Amino acid sequence: MKKLIMVLAATVICGASLFTSCKKDEDNDLKLEEKIIGKWMVTDMNGKPLPSNEKTVYTFVSATKATVSTSINTHPEVGTHWNDRLDADVTIDDNKITLTDHPDETTTVVEEYIVTDISGTEFTANHKVVVTKDGIVVDNDNHVLRLVKVTADYSTAILGKWECQELTGIETFNDANARLEFFADGTYNYWRKNDAGEWEAVTNREFQNYFVDGTLLATRWKNTGEDELREWWEIASIANGQMQWTALRQNADGTTAQQGMKWVKVN
């Protein structure tokens, strides 16, 4: 009888070990270390499309390193951040990806992605983010996110001077009377046509910055004596001297509206 009990116990232990091994193999079947490499943009949260100003681009250069690009000034609890390819540490454990970065000297951001599905073009995950400032948690959120792989990077193609040809949808800070020149150092110049039909540079700004990561374009500027302003766009295409932008905007009542701009390259 004692021998039978020992055999049964051994069977249970082996069975449990086999189940654990199978479960681990199932997680490893995701092959996150391989599939995650590349550039990804967050496009949906909890089943709804994200406005352009809420989007983030992650570039996984390896299974241990990534960069994060995002422009944040609409969430007072986490402060204002301008993250142009901010370095992040990455750990991957089965189907969990953890990113840790430091937007400034006092802030730490830890993101956990529990990946539920991944392909060569997109992945979905249960996402948790914890933001601490001076060791105090200032933000702790959980969402279901969808990320899409970004194959284009317009950070070089956007360089040069562009003239707006058309603006569709709602107007925010821009109208069709605009020329922009983007420089490799992350600054840009802005011109407007005066009443005489001549282009004049806008000179009342303390700074004008931008970054492009993949298809995400973020700008920020500050007029003398005024608050800093920001805007977000997604570059739909740049080809043959033509450039198209698109953006999903969210109104105060929660409704959304699409906006677009078309540009042509000029000398």
What are these regions (language model features)?
Residues 3-6, 11-43, 140-154, 260-267:
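Bacterial Sec-dependent N-terminal signal peptides
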Residues 16, 55, 92-94, 98-147:
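Extended, hydrophobic interaction surfaces within ordered domains
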Residues 32-50, 151-173, 208-209:
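Tryptophan-anchored aromatic micro-motifs
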Residues 36, 40-42, 58-60, 97, ...:
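Fold-core signature of tandem repeat domains
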Residues 42-47, 68-74, 99-104, 126-131, ...:
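Beta-turn initiation residues at beta-strand->coil junctions
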Residues 51-97, 172-224:
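N-terminal glycine/threonine-rich, aromatic-flanked beta-hairpin/loop signature
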Residues 98-115, 216-235:
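An anionic, turn-rich surface loop/hairpin at beta-sheet edges
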Residues 129-161, 204-210, 247-267:
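Edge beta-strand at a domain terminus
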